[in-house]
Amino acid sequence: MSFLKTTTVVVTLTAGLLLSTVAQAHPKLLSSTPAEGSDAAAPSKIELHFSENLTTQFSGAKLIMTDMPGMPNSPMGVKAGVSGGGDPKTMVITPTSPLTTGTYKVEWRAVSSDTHPITGNFSFKVK
């Protein structure tokens, strides 16, 4: 094979690998406030920071109280609004009422430009 043909094959294969990697990229949760597993005062909002810009109309989250002192019932949903943050890589959950002492779980769904939904969850405690 000539040098030119070999170079063309190598460049084509490299470009194909790079494009397939970009096409398969999905948003990843990089951090949250409060952080996963944290034990802190009640936050007025919960921020989720992702690795990619989110498509807000297809992304969302639920806030669930999973445990509290004297809680005899099953986990219960907490009313909260979900919106994009000032940064397109941020999702903000704002409870409609102050959070009380207990354990909370955030279940999130993130969709970026590749349109594949990625889901996850994390928990934190409120003192």
Language model features by range: what are they?
Residues 1-11:
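Bacterial N-terminal signal peptides that target proteins for export
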Residues 38, 52-124:
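Acidic, low-complexity Ser/Thr/Gly/Pro-rich repeat segments typical of extracellular/periplasmic
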Residues 24-62:
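N-terminal non-catalytic regions of secreted/periplasmic and cell-surface proteins
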Residues 20-22:
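N-terminal signal peptide c-region/cleavage motif recognized by signal peptidases
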